[in-house]
Amino acid sequence: MVSFKLPAFLCVAVLSSMALVSHGAVLGLCEGACPEGWVEHKNRCYLHVAEKKTWLDAELNCLHHGGNLASEHSEDEHQFLKDLHKGSDDPFWIGLSAVHEGRSWLWSDGTSASAEGDFSMWNPGEPNDAGGKEDCVHDNYGGQKHWNDIKCDLLFPSICVLRMVE
């Protein structure tokens, strides 16, 4: 198998011309700087999307750009996303949901959030699945500005992530 990487300017062209990208299909081809408008942090590129969307529409928007809604696997990532959210106190979508069969918490990039020892940043008393209809998660909520489970059809800004290859 032949292995190659596209320079950053071609990577941007490829990602921006794709309607939907299967998980990670193009990311392995990209090297160097993040696409224009994205911010690099620890070998990942992040895009703050100010337009308010439902959780599903936010995820589809991230897929359109070749990524997923952002996942948080450390305190550092959690703080970085909050800082990237333009210093706003408003909540924003992250890639955590229980919308799939089995209803355990999974990140939209396929990584688990339910196993013992996994990083979590739930507000006290969360997740509470109020009314049995809270299957998606937004960050920067409540007094502590952490995670909250909420209805997926509400509208919030979001943050997308692309994983880069070294």
Curated annotation (Swiss-Prot):
Any one GO biological process: induction of bacterial agglutination
Name assigned to this protein: Lactose-binding lectin l-2
Pfam family, one: Lectin_C
Functional summary from the UniProt entry: Involved in host defense at the body surface. Causes agglutination and suppresses the growth of the Gram-negative bacterium E.coli K12. Possesses calcium-independent hemagglutinating activity.
PROSITE patterns: C_TYPE_LECTIN_1, C_TYPE_LECTIN_2
Gene that produces this protein: l-2
Keyword Disulfide bond annotated: yes
GO molecular function: carbohydrate binding
Lineage: Eukaryota, Metazoa, Chordata, Craniata, Vertebrata
